[in-house]
Amino acid sequence: MKHLQELPLVSVIMPVYNAGDFLVPAIDSILSQTYKNFELIIVNDASTDNSATVLAEYKKKYPRLITIISLTKNRNAGGDACANIALEKARGTYIARMDADDVALPSRLEKEVAYLESHPSVFLVGSNASVINKTGNTIGDKLEPLTSSEIYQQYFTFHPLIHPTTMFRREFKGKPFSYRIKYSANNDYYTFFSLLCEGGKFANLPEKLIQYRIHGKNDTFVHMKKKFINTLRIRIEMILKKGYRPSPKAVLTTLVQGVIIITLPEAVITQLYFLSKGITKASFPSFATKPLLIVKQKVSMLG
């Protein structure tokens, strides 16, 4: 077995905004990793709950392992902008993204490092995930395509990466990686779609290496109509500026997505998204039942 110093350093970066209810299991899951050569860099985006107090306690216990960057004013630019601040401090060969409300399985870092070490041509690796609710009960799974070619083909119709499962190399084509902040949301989708079009290879491991938490306040499920417009702009940009060529089926799927998202209430859209990802135990608002029956056959096209 290699000594700790011989293993590649992993920089785990975690943006935090008002995540006090879930911070303890999230941080503990990183501290409990079987892979020990890592640093944890947390950016607190001016949280107004008890996040700062929780983080201060961890900093006292692990002063060398954990770095806390506290912003005094909320940047209102999302987690990816905060992640860029963490990246400026990162020393690792590999970067692992972690969200403050999720739980990493103990072998996550070990398996992702092993994959990147044995696949030098792959820039990024992610995994599948179990989906849990606010109290930690499993309510479904998030399953994504595994190979680079499958990910490339499906990127136009949905985001085939679970962001908090991803680990990637510190550099892309000789330059330090950073998130490309261009839109009000969806900048991870924009960044990784751009890298994919620029020759980056991605992969997903079949194992479920995190518990992805849905608790009603996830940024992913807020303002979904607005985010779809951003996504549409990104897709068009990839065609016009990056040379991406979607299949006819992908174009048709995007049109169906547009019709559904424009015409249905946002609450129904969210539940359809849950269904499309196999999250079958999420609760449905009473007014959503009838529309869901009408469009249920089209769920698989939401991506």
Please place each PLM-identified region on the residue numbering:
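N-proximal low-complexity "stem/linker" segments adjacent to membrane-targeting elements
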Residues: M1-L31
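C-terminal subregions of glycosyltransferases and related glycan-biosynthesis enzymes
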Residues: K2-Q5, K182-A185, Y189-F193, C197-G303
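Acidic helix N-cap motif at the loop->helix transition within catalytic regions
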Residues: F22-V24, D49-Y58, V103, S107
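A conserved acidic beta->alpha catalytic loop
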Residues: N44-T53, K73, D99
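Glycine-rich, basic loop-to-helix element that forms the pyrophosphate-binding segment
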Residues: L71-A90, K111
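Conserved nucleotide-sugar donor-binding catalytic segment
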Residues: E88, L105, S127, D141, ...
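Short aromatic/hydrophobic "clamp" motif used to bind/position activated sugar donors
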Residues: I95
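Conserved donor NDP-sugar-binding/catalytic core segment of glycosyltransferases
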Residues: S107-I139
